[in-house]
């Protein structure tokens, strides 16, 4: 039986689960771990098939969420970045009693562009899937570079993301393809109308993967949720703007 890698950090009286994005692992939170650890008990996890949670194949969103839920705290704020935002959202849908609040970071309920909905063109996601089998390492690096484009610290931020990937075992191509398939096909826009826990959505103004145009659309679709756009951030605001990012979480915590 394979186990998912978890680590608990910090001694705060509020539990916070942090879920990373596609191709990465829990080391991505290293730059904010100290700051958040004095206010929260952090639960860091490598998603199934990523980092130290090896031995898993490609999964659907539902399967991935079920695996993560097995060893998760009874109640916590669930924060998911990018692909991790879909896992956190699915957790809020399937186990609402365990989700004190939901936070999505540079994430979308529907990453793929649809009619009347801004997103990544499906053919671009399909292209990434094709390139993975051709040149695995280069495709992952290209995807990481896209995440920091436009920020004042873009090169440095991209190096940070690359070091996170290289710090742990690389996911299998099958797992990465499965993650891209989730990004290409999942649409939780309607389902998330029904969540009623506090729900904060954080975006980067310069994000090239999750367009800021979705923020007002979701403000209308999900009036119970709150959105915040970080002015000079791209797809990884916790790396480029750690202080503002942590402050947004402290504000949420104080409102619970």
Swiss-Prot record:
The keyword Cytoplasm applies. It is found in: Cytoplasm. Residues 15-242 form the AB hydrolase-1 domain. Its main location: cytoplasm. The keyword DNA repair does not apply. The active site is at residues 82, 207, 235. Substrate binds at residues 22, 82-83, 143-147, 235. PANTHER family: HYDROLASE ALPHA/BETA FOLD FAMILY (PTHR43194), PIMELOYL-[ACYL-CARRIER PROTEIN] METHYL ESTER ESTERASE (PTHR43194:SF5). NCBIfam families: bioH, PRK10349.1. The physiological role of BioH is to remove the methyl group introduced by BioC when the pimeloyl moiety is complete. It allows to synthesize pimeloyl-ACP via the fatty acid synthetic pathway through the hydrolysis of the ester bonds of pimeloyl-ACP esters. This is Pimeloyl-[acyl-carrier protein] methyl ester esterase. It comes from Salmonella paratyphi A (strain AKU_12601). The lineage of its organism: Bacteria, Pseudomonadati, Pseudomonadota, Gammaproteobacteria, Enterobacterales.
